[in-house]
Amino acid sequence: MLIKSVLSSLPIHILAASAPPKGVLSTLEKLFANFLWGSAETGSRYHWIGWDSLYKPFVEGGAGVRALADVLESFSLKLWWSFRQRKSLWYEFMHAKYLYNVHVCEAEYLPLQSIIWKRMVRCHGLAESHIQWVSQNGSVDFWHENWMGIGPLCQR
């Protein structure tokens, strides 16, 4: 339980606000493994559980620790969802800066743009495939939004 509560919560704030490279994530996971298994002066300790088993939920016999790459992806998807809500000053800024006269479905990353924008564009395909809009008052974009559940018509 200590492993889950301490190790899983430490990088959460970093992953929510930035996009560290894969090398940083693997280094952090190596540090977690060293903390878990440790090492004695005479050599390494016995590994009571495999690292892959730690990532499994409790009900599947694991420790419930989440892989950092999965946490990063979930925060990226959350960023994209927040962006798609269109209800914040942050949305207005990001849309004006990166999507001027372009629909969200046509978002792309160009060199010298924000790392956060790159992170969002990288996950937008996955996010859009799970977003479905319900037309109640005619506010859904007929051509660009996934309102039928088969994806946007512009991608057909």
Across the structure, where does each feature detected by a protein language model lie?
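A helix-boundary/hinge signal
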Residues: 1-156
